[in-house]
Amino acid sequence: MEWELRPGRDERLAGNLDTSLLKTLALCFMLIDHLGVALFGNLLEMRVLGRIALPLYAWCLIVGNVKTRHPLRYFGRLLLLAVLSQPLYMMALSHSWRHLNILFLLALATAAIQSIRLRRFGSQFWGPALCYLVLGFCEIDYGWRGLTFILLLYLARGSRGGLAAAFLGYALFWGSSSQTVTTFFGYELGFLRWPGLGDLFSAFFHLQTLAWLALPLILTRTSSGLKMPKWLGYGLYPLHLVLLIVLRLMFGGATWAGIISCFH
């Protein structure tokens, strides 16, 4: 039996509500990122653009969790897609069963958010804690850092300033140990060496910190008119994995034997 939870249709959401557009953009940036991994030897510029995908998916997930009338169905759709996508994810990006795709993270984040919203028997505390415990036993794309990022954005959802502060603060922390991006498509980022300001700018140009490139898309209200069926928003994820497999076979020098070896 599904629990009763009043949807927050009048709940303030400070960011962009044009989620069909954001999901489409997220998929495009994720495809660029995965093409960089699968076909272009981890080309840095493509990985940079790929950092935009997770924040867009995270914000769309938050909007969906606030708006949904059926949280269990929302969670179930994500979990089903995650399970169905896993073999494709393994074949497209040469991962093993132990490395789970991003839809598992989004499903787990949904469980954490709905536990916070439910507020029954202290669920706002033990619900997220259980989700972190699951991450201790499962290797899921983006891991505990990704879950923390999504929860911070959820908690700051009602304030544009709060969203920006939570986003930038956590992105700076998350990216601090990743490599500094000093060139972009052959253009040297000379301002990173400016006296006095170079170190400050450099903090924002670590690879993972460059997720901040998604922030204007989240904060700027748009009205694209694009309407996407509920199932299609995340349903495009496995389709892009099929495309990656085909491209690897056609242009990446991969063979079927090599692609299915991930199941061994």
What does each model-found stretch correspond to?
Residues M1-H264:
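Alpha-helical transmembrane segments and their immediate juxtamembrane cytosolic regions
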